[in-house]
Amino acid sequence: METRRNFLKKTAAIAGGVGVMGLGGASLSGCSNSNDPLFKISLAEWSLNKSIFGKSRQLGSEEWAKLLTDDPDALLQGNIKHLDFAKVAHQDFGIDAVEYVNTFFFNKATNKNYLKEMKTIADGEGVKNLLIMCDREGALGDPDEAARTIAVENHYKWVDAAKRLGCHSIRVNAQSEGEYDEQMKLAADGLSRLTEYGTKNDINVIVENHGGLSSNGKWLSGVMDMVNHPHCGTLPDFGNFYLGSWEEKEMNGTIVISA
C-alpha cells in the first residue's frame, strides 16, 4: 500500500520539478529513515466539497449562485457538516491543519458564536486553522472603481473571521477584465487595498492562480511586483497554470518565480 510519506516524496519531486533536478544528484531518500514527516500538510475543505454540498452540486450555476446569496445553508446537503470538517481532517485523515472555504459558511462570517464554535472544535482536535479561501465576493480587479471598492470591502469580514479563527491568511482571486497590463494594474490596486486592511489585523492576503490571467504565471508575478507588500503573496495551484501558448523555458521560469 502507498504510504502518505512515499506519496509526499513523489509529489514533492513532481511539484518541485526543475528545483529538485537542479540539486545535481541530491535526492529525498535521505529522509526515509526519519520518523518526522517530509512535509506538514493541510487539508483544503474544497477536497470534500461533494460530501458537504451533496445533491446541491447538481444544480445549475445560476440557481446555485442564487441560493448561495439567498439561503446558503440550503446548499449544504451532504453527509459531512461544515462544523465537522476539522474533526474529519484529524480523525479520518490524520491531518492536523485545515484550510476553510467561505462558501461552506457563507452567511456566518460575522457570527461570533459560530466562529467560536468552529475554533473550539478545531482546538479540541488539535487542528490548526490556517486560512479561509474566499470566493463569490466580487472581482478585486473590477474595471469599475465603485464595484472594485465593494469587492475589497466585501472581503473585510473574512479577514475579521480569519483572525477570530486563528488563521494566518485569507486566499483570494485576482479577477479582472480588460487588456493584459490594465488587468494587472486593477488587480494590484484591489489587492493592495485589501492587504492594507489585512495587515492591520495580522492577516496575510494570498492569491491563487485561479482562472483568467491569474493562471498566467508571468502576469501573476507581475501583479505581486506591483503590490510589493510582505503580507501579500501567492498560493500556487500547480494544476491551474495554463501552459498552452507559452514557450516551455519561459513558462517554467515564471512558475518558479510565482511559487
Positions of predicted regions on the chain:
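Glycine-rich, phosphate-binding/catalytic loops in enzymes
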Residues: 25, 59-60, 222-224, 251-253
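Active-site groove signature of glycoside hydrolases
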Residues: 162-182, 201, 206-214
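Positively charged, amphipathic and often flexible ligand-engagement surfaces
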Residues: 240
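Noncatalytic carbohydrate-binding groove/subsite architecture in carbohydrate-active enzymes
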Residues: 247-253, 257
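Short glycine/serine/threonine-biased micro-segments
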Residues: 15, 209, 237
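Basic- and aromatic-lined ligand-binding clefts that recognize polyanionic substrates
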Residues: 198-231, 243-246
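N-terminal pre-domain/capping segments
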Residues: 2-164, 182-185, 192, 199, ...
